[in-house]
Amino acid sequence: KKKKNEAESPRLDPLMRALKALHSAGAPETMTEEELEHLFRDAIREMTPMLDRLAALSTQADNNEADRETAFYIGLLARMLLSAVIEGDRADTAAFMDGVEPPVFPEDMRPIWAERLAFMEKKLAAFPRKTPIDLARQTISDTCAAGAAGSGGVYRLNVPTGGGKTLASLRFALTHAAKRNCSRIIFTAPLLSILDQNAHVIRDYMGDDTLILEHHSNLAETKEAPERLQELELLTASWSAPIIITTLVQLLNTCFSGRTSAIRRFHALCGSVIVIDEVQTVPGKMLTLFNLTVNFLSEICGVTIVLCSATQPCLEVVDHPLRRQPVDLVPQQKALWDIFKRTDIQNAGCARLEELPQIVMGALSSCDSLLVVCNTKKEAAFLFELLQAANCRCFHLSAAMCVQHRRETLQALQSALDKPSADRQRVVCVSTQVIEAGVDISFQRVIRFS
């Protein structure tokens, strides 16, 4: 089934049907040789201006490099067409063989986006606005909502840690999608710990789980009914849900992997809003591919891309830069960043691992919550064992723990920290670097191994 934005002219409709027939069972019997020849002549006439548009995307002065970029864009266009053909073939086959079809969402998604945006705005209105940080987060969120009135393209959300990027980007995406009738909103994050946290926030502020699909390795939908499992499998294969929450790896696979399952999802990016959290984690060796694909998606496929990070990479000054300078959703203001400076960093010097329990207990004498971040799992396990006898409640976090164990430990840790100071024991968390991956939790003091 062809979805909107997969073709820019109705003349491609019969061509897509012909391609689908050729892909699955040879030339259609109802099409004469003259009709097929006519379709291909029309396709050639339509491709000429498209090739001119692709050539115009190049940012290279050198003709050879410009030709290489254009060839890459043509490859992405071919991938998009193949994705649409595969999706139609697989979806129809699943419907015929199993009698299961994914939910059908309307072409005009604006009422759905507007309804979810109203739900979110109501929840945001209940937020406290007492402290300078509360007011700064509100300013960031309001600025993002105002910026959503702009056209599509590439946007940059560069705000300090703790500035409320998840909610601000969600508010931007819903507002923008409601104005431009975007097909779907795709949220990505580089690490599963960040993704789990963001998914919880997004579900809470959307208020309708039927619109949301999570696609990552932490999921095991074993408690669902068999019919729902088949439905989820189809949604995952095609990314046809209105809101997709996935990893950066899955997004990059969708753009570059040669696997048929990845190619099938590529067409779902058309006309969407893609929010890429912690964009600085894109590997340096992939920046050329990443930038060129962002150019293609934003300029040819009508995709709006939001690059989120507190430490933005300079994607416009590499060998193959972004074609357009990203639009900053929040202007850089030193006063705004100063509000979020809540730490005082001190160099504690050198110490042996065996001496650290004494240092930790000394730090606890002036606070009642402490985080110790170790470089290795072995260091964290060793220190945790030594602190078991201390008069405090001690927690251990490590990437070696299974996801459910780590999630339960984080919940217990958060519950301990939420208790009033007068009613709780002193709390110590000994962790590997896993806790630095965007985990939303606060301590009075932190000891970080160098």
Can you annotate each of these PLM segments?
Residues K1-F119:
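Accessory nucleic-acid engagement/destabilization modules that flank
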Residues A399-V403, R424-S450:
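Conserved RecA-like helicase motor core of SF1/SF2 enzymes
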Residues L124-N158:
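Conserved pre-motif I regulatory segment
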Residues V249, A262-I300:
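SF2 helicase catalytic motif II
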Residues R184-L195, A363-Q388, F395-H396:
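Conserved strand-helix element at the start of the C-terminal RecA-like helicase core
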Residues S151-A173:
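Walker A/P-loop
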Residues D208-F256:
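Inter-Walker segment of RecA-like/P-loop motor cores
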